[in-house]
From Swiss-Prot:
Location relative to the cell: Mitochondrion
Lineage: Eukaryota, Metazoa, Chordata, Craniata, Vertebrata
Keywords carried by this UniProt record: Mitochondrion, Ribonucleoprotein, Ribosomal protein, Transit peptide
This protein's record includes keyword Mitochondrion: yes
GO CC list: mitochondrial inner membrane; mitochondrial large ribosomal subunit; mitochondrial ribosome; mitochondrion
Xref: InterPro entries: Ribosomal_bL20, Ribosomal_protein_bL20_C
Subunit structure and binding partners: Component of the mitochondrial large ribosomal subunit (mt-LSU). Mature mammalian 55S mitochondrial ribosomes consist of a small (28S) and a large (39S) subunit. The 28S small subunit contains a 12S ribosomal RNA (12S mt-rRNA) and 30 different proteins. The 39S large subunit contains a 16S rRNA (16S mt-rRNA), a copy of mitochondrial valine transfer RNA (mt-tRNA(Val)), which plays an integral structural role, and 52 different proteins. Interacts with OXA1L.
SUPFAM superfamilies named among the record's database cross-references: Ribosomal protein L20
Biological process (GO), any one: mitochondrial translation
A Pfam family hit: Ribosomal_L20
Family: Belongs to the bacterial ribosomal protein bL20 family.
This protein's name: Large ribosomal subunit protein bL20m
Gene Ontology MF: a single term: RNA binding
Transit peptide, residues from-to: 1-9
Gene name tied to this protein: MRPL20
Length: 149
């Protein structure tokens, strides 16, 4: 490639500016009013939207955890247990299910959740040895209870 003049050798900065503006306006297309047409307004709005998007990722996690806890609380109260008692006694019985799985079990598998609540209730009232009973677990649940002989 041969450049005959110095002007052809230098970069054309106008096209860079054009594509930079179009990139911002592309993100602002769905905004209402002048914010999707005027570059100066679009830049502010797009930056603000990106900041809110970043914060919303953490809020979503927090809101989902609150939702799971509310669902587990409601389901455990149907079986006569409070939420802290249910979670604490399931941990003591070495049932390693997180809140998301417990909330899903409470909604879609109520019999399984009922047996988990029964296990936690027995552990609460009688202790770990009584929770194991005769060495069998309640029907319909799987846990990682280690039995020592």
């Amino acid at each position: 490639m041969v450049f005959l003049t110095a002007q052809l050798w230098l970069r054309n900065r106008v096209t860079d500016r054009y594509f930079r503006i179009q990139e911002v306006l592309k993100h602002a297309r769905h905004f209402r009013g002048r914010k999707n047409r005027c570059y100066r307004l679009a830049v502010r709005t797009v930056i603000r939207a990106f900041v809110k998007c970043t914060k919303a990722r953490y809020l979503k996690k927090k809101n989902m955890r609150t939702l799971w806890i509310n669902r587990i609380t409601a389901a455990s109260q149907e079986h006569g247990l409070k939420y802290p008692a249910l979670i604490g006694n399931l941990v003591k019985c070495q049932v390693e299910l997180n809140r998301k799985v417990l909330a899903d079990l409470a909604i879609y598998e109520p019999k399984t959740f009922k047996s988990l609540a029964a296990l936690a209730s027995r552990r609460r009232h009688e202790g770990f040895a009584a929770a194991l009973g005769d060495g069998k677990e309640p029907e319909g649940i799987f846990s990682r209870v280690v039995q020592y002989h």
